[in-house]
């Protein structure tokens, strides 16, 4: 198992050296970088704003945060506008069904045939 650990350490050292040497458009470790820029092949540290030899830039985490609130706001806006209209329309037919009942009782009193 010790040989496997040594091979893993050599692989990590080689990966760090490859980022330090840099290729086209790659800045060396310790160089100043901007968040979201592709000049740093590793990771641009947010606190120190320095290049670090890590695979997987943090640019992938930003669009997931931006897309989640847009999905949340689009859904409830349609349901909120339709819910109050349904609530106001539902009690109206119940009131209309109750109102004609006293009018039917009043009609025979308004028609005096004895005179």
UniProtKB/Swiss-Prot annotation:
Q: Which residues cross the membrane?
A: none
Description of its domains:
The presence of a 'disulfide through disulfide knot' structurally defines this protein as a knottin.
**Basic residues bias locations:** 68-77, 86-115
Q: What is its main location?
A: secreted
Q: What is this protein called?
A: Cysteine-rich venom protein 5
> Which cystines does this chain contain?
26-41, 33-44, 40-51
Alphabetic keyword roster: Disulfide bond, Knottin, Secreted, Signal
Where, by tissue, is this protein expressed?
Answer: Expressed by the venom gland.
Per the record, its GO cellular-component terms are: extracellular region
Name where it's found: Secreted
Q: Which domain of life is it from?
A: Eukaryota
Q: Where is this region: Disordered?
A: 54-115
Signal peptide residue numbers: 1-22
């Amino acid at each position: 198992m010790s040989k496997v650990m040594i091979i893993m350490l050599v692989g990590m050292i080689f990966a760090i050296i490859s980022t330090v040497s840099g290729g086209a458009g790659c800045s060396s470790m310790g160089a100043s970088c901007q968040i979201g820029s592709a000049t740093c092949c590793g990771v641009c540290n947010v606190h120190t704003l320095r290049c670090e030899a890590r695979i997987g830039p943090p640019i992938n985490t930003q669009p997931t945060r931006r897309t989640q609130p847009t999905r949340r706001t689009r859904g409830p806006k349609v349901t909120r506008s339709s819910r109050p209209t349904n609530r106001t329309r539902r009690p109206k037919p119940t009131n209309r069904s109750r109102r004609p009942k006293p009018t039917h009782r009043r009609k025979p009193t308004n028609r005096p045939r004895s005179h």
